[in-house]
Amino acid sequence: MKHILVTGAAGYIGGRLIPLLLETGHHVRVVARDVTRLSDLPWANQVETIEADLNVDDSVGRALEGIDVAYYLVHSMGSGEGFHRRDLEMANLFARKAREANVERIIYLSALGHESTGLTEHLRSRQETGRHLANFGGDVIELRAGPVVGAGSLPFEMIRYLTERVPVMVCPRWVFTKVQPIGLSDVLAYLAASINLKGKGHEIIEIGGSEIISYGQMMTGYARIRGLRRVMIRVPVLTPRLSSLWVHLITPLRGSFARPIVEGLRNEVVVHDPQALKMFPEIVPLGYESAVQSALDDLRPSSLPPTRPLPVIPEDLVIQTINNAGIIRESRSKYVAASHQSVFDAFTTLGGEQGWYMDWGWRLRGALDWLLGGPGLRRTRPSGDVKKGDLVDFWRVENVTQGQSLLLRAEMKLPGDAWLEFTATSSNETGTLLTQNSYFAPKGLAGVIYWYALLPIHKPVFNGLIRRIATIAAAGNHRRSNSK
């Protein structure tokens, strides 16, 4: 068993690597500036958590104390101008403190790219960070990867949103740059296997998927899997600045993230030294479309990061909306003066003869669904407790946790996939925090238009629904109580 530190635990790589490390019996310590962001993650109670800032001397020393292997999974790309300098300063501090703590090995996820091609500042920063980490004197395994194909990866999210939302794409030259994308599961496998890799000093290992393609082929391959028809028109000139503004306009990516990504697309990022295939013979990299399919299989509410904890208990309705990893989440929270069991009973008895809120609206939606070839609004629900797989009108129970939560998946005809989730969390001795999440994973531009067209209707329907649940729970007027 190794004592392992994972930095960047709240990120899409670190958060998925931790379960693999725990499965193999390692003691895992995670570090974050704000540990409350980790509290709702499924592995939170299985790890040691330290609140620390990797830019502060004492914080880094405390995080590395007693550690055998440290994963360095952070960089400052989204922090504005000067990120290159901050990356190197942070790496130097981490290396110095690792040496003082007698850390055996640092494992760092870097980026592919050959210096002879004139690397962009972002790619150059990633590689120079590896050299600065090597100053600590112990082993450094630097895994250089191309675009990672998986939910949360910024290059993949850019490909996803552009392909989903733009039927006819005007493509600059960078769209035809050669790349070697790698599936998220393969990256995690390489990272986990690097703990026991035999090697000394600074080892640079290039990792990639099984295919070398272009960014344009990444988009057309994604479209093929999603059943979307896309037309690409090549143009001779479209500056990185204009391209990044276009990406920012079309996708949820912030401009501070979009620009370094777009600028980096002019560099070929392919494996030149395939030694990883010999060093890790147990890992057989996926092809691009297999990696995309794996990412799409993960397109469900559980793939999203938890909602941020509310700063205060809401006396009235609090609404939060995010667009992340291909899913839009509209979250409503309300304090209810009732036990969490009463709140759970209230939302698990919705549907059937009890109905919902604004029943006429649900009936109208059911009639439209029936006309489009869907099942329509079936007045049905189990007579007792709901369980996974049960039908509740035009919803299917996808998951239920007794006394805590209910997740329903829509069986309506939709340009995408939709879910409705309710959770009850005890907030104090006399009340419960009721949370209602509506999720939608739009398919193509039609799905995006559908979501925004219905937004004006969402407010009265979903606001009324959560208030009705709160009223039923507070009054004790739910079906289960009436049967006692």
Predicted regions and their residues:
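Beta-strand/loop substructures that line and gate deep hydrophobic ligand-binding cavities in soluble
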Residues: 259, 410-457
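NAD(P)H-binding glycine-rich loop region in Rossmannoid oxidoreductase-like domains
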Residues: 36, 40-103, 112-115
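Mid/C-terminal beta-alpha module of Rossmann-like enzyme folds, strongest
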Residues: 194-260, 268-332
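A conserved amphipathic terminal alpha-helix motif
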Residues: 447-484
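Conserved beta-loop-beta element that borders a ligand/cofactor-binding pocket
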Residues: 110, 131-154, 158-161, 165, ...
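Substrate-positioning beta->alpha
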Residues: 90, 154-155, 174-195, 203
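N-terminal Rossmann NAD(P)H-binding glycine-rich loop of SDR-like oxidoreductase domains
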Residues: 2-26
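Glycine-rich portal/gate segments that line the openings of hydrophobic small-molecule binding cavities
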Residues: 335-344, 348-415, 468
